Swiss-Prot record:
Keywords: Aminoacyl-tRNA synthetase, ATP-binding, Cytoplasm, Ligase, Nucleotide-binding, Protein biosynthesis. It catalyses: tRNA(Asn) + L-asparagine + ATP = L-asparaginyl-tRNA(Asn) + AMP + diphosphate + H(+). InterPro entries: Aa-tRNA-synt_II (IPR004364), aa-tRNA-synth_II (IPR006195), aa-tRNA-synth_II/BPL/LPL (IPR045864), Asn-tRNA-ligase (IPR004522), Asp/Asn-tRNA-synth_IIb (IPR002312), NA-bd_OB-fold (IPR012340). Belongs to the class-II aminoacyl-tRNA synthetase family. Its EC number is 6.1.1.22. It comes from the Eukaryota. The keyword Iron does not apply. GO terms for biological process: asparaginyl-tRNA aminoacylation. Its main location: cytoplasm. It holds the Pfam family tRNA-synt_2. This is Probable asparagine--tRNA ligase, cytoplasmic. GO terms for molecular function: asparagine-tRNA ligase activity; ATP binding.
Length: 458
């Protein structure tokens, strides 16, 4: 009975949203040139064209209707010489003639509609989202949220940031690779691994592509990848995801200071290129938006030890309200405090962490570990990097220290035998950087479909 009631309800809804196509009399649709909406411009003035789009807005009076159609971020104004009722997001195929725009709006031209068809015969139901929808509803209906202006802007911003990153790498002779995401090794600690059965063998979703980049870098000199990584952390902060886009690079024949210079160049170049392309689109939605502006001064550096002493001197407490001591992890809130005070709201490198704070592969010199985290205003860490250990025995000691069986890493250990060289690399959290640049409140907003402990859908 319940199934029958549901079917009746669906049938009733379909009848409600069913809509008739419309056409002027005696038009020959074969005389209209088909063109994609994105390619329509004023060079087609007075020409007959046919195109396809989605209703962005619709208003009508007793004798005329104004419809905005959207596709590929472009909006076209259509004028229909009769009253029609079309819901937002309904799909239309339109036959019309381009005319000069007679309205007081931003459109350069308008389409005098001669006919339209509703694709599938049904217009879209009432849209279930609006600017007042709560966070969970927006995440539950993220597939529909992509039709909203702020999420359309997100898609544009995501695309522009990926382009800006790749432009830096390609302009600086990096080689892009596509390493595997099913692995039998760990990089960041076994507690954060997603384990799965791989043809009756244990395997994991990758935490990082670093080890594979290290095998490629000796061949190409500089390698990078932009791939998903996975962390089984039950963290509920605004900057953590269980699946995220990991921008990683590895460079050979490089020293520690050069590595940090490369990271800084990447950040500066990417931000400049990103805003150059996306800022006009942001301003259309938020005219008061202020982009991130970096100082011309080189990013400051502070050692882990000096940072702890600085926090103590500033009477800045840990999350449990006790004093910091050497050996403590520096919390997210304390990273932000360092940025605001020591960093003067500019990015800073936090460097030379204790050995037991970093994985088996990090290299050391007389000053300590050659490690760096780039902290960024508003969020904290966005990049983690280090020089890599190249001595075979030191690597074995690192595995032993972390209680890791080195046998699955035999291929990685070969790198220490077959022509090792000074090399280093880093990983950048793409969603974190996008969150900073777009002034989002959470990485949930800077990912297409959020994946975290409480969410694996849609």
């Amino acid at each position: 009975m319940k199934l029958q009631d549901n079917l009746k309800s669906i049938k009733k809804e379909l009848e409600r949203i069913k809509v008739e196509n419309w056409s002027k009399e005696n038009i020959d649709k074969n005389t209209y040139r088909y063109i994609r909406l994105f390619d329509i411009d004023d060079s087609l003035m007075n020409q007959k064209i046919c195109f396809f789009g989605w209703v962005k807005s619709s208003r009508s009076s007793s004798k005329i209707s104004f419809i905005e159609l959207i596709s590929q971020f472009k909006i076209i104004k259509c004028v229909i010489p009769t009253k029609v009722k079309l819901t937002d997001h309904t799909t239309l195929k339109v036959w019309g003639i381009m005319k000069p725009n007679n309205g007081n709006d931003e459109h350069q031209f308008e389409i005098d509609v001669q006919a339209y068809e509703v694709y599938g015969g049904y217009q879209a139901p009432s849209f279930p989202l609006n600017i007042h929808s709560d966070k969970d509803t927006l995440l539950d209906l993220a597939h529909l949220g992509l039709r909203m202006p702020h999420r359309i802007l997100f898609l544009q911003a995501q695309n522009e940031l990926l382009k800006a990153l790749r432009k830096f790498y390609w302009n600086n002779n990096y080689t892009e690779i596509t390493p595997p995401t099913l692995v039998q090794t760990q990089v960041e600690g076994g507690a954060t691994l997603f384990k799965l059965n791989y043809y009756d063998q244990p395997a994991y979703l990758t935490q990082s592509s670093q080890l594979y980049l290290e095998t490629v870098a000796p061949v190409v000199g500089k390698a990078f990848c932009i791939m998903p990584s996975y962390r089984a952390e039950k963290s509920k902060t605004s900057r953590h995801l269980s699946e995220f886009t990991h921008v990683e690079a590895e460079l050979v024949d490089i020293q520690f200071d050069e590595l940090m210079d490369q990271i800084e160049q990447l950040i500066r170049s990417t931000i400049n290129e990103f805003y150059k392309n996306i800022l006009p689109e942001i301003k259309k939605i938020d005219n008061d938006f202020q982009p991130v502006v970096l100082s011309d001064k080189q990013f400051k550096k502070i050692t882990y030890e000096d940072a702890i002493h600085f926090l103590i001197a500033q009477n800045h407490k840990k999350t449990d309200n006790t004093d910091y001591q050497l050996g403590d992890d520096i919390s997210d809130a304390s990273e932000k405090f360092l940025l605001e005070t020591y960093g003067e709201n500019q990015p800073i490198f936090l460097i030379r962490f204790p050995t037991d704070h970093k994985p088996f592969y990090v290299a050391k010199d007389q000053y300590g570990t050659q490690t760096c985290d780039l902290l960024f205003p508003g969020i904290g860490e966005i990049v983690g990097g280090s020089m890599r250990e190249t001595n075979y025995n030191n690597l074995l000691d690192g595995f032993k220290r972390e209680n890791i069986d080195h046998e699955p890493y035999s291929w990685y250990l070969d790198m220490a035998k077959f022509g090792p060289s000074p090399h280093g690399g880093y990983g950048l959290g793409f969603e974190r950087l996008l969150m900073c640049l777009m002034k989002y409140k959470s990485v949930d907003q800077s990912t297409l479909y959020c994946r975290k402990p409480s969410r694996c859908t849609p």
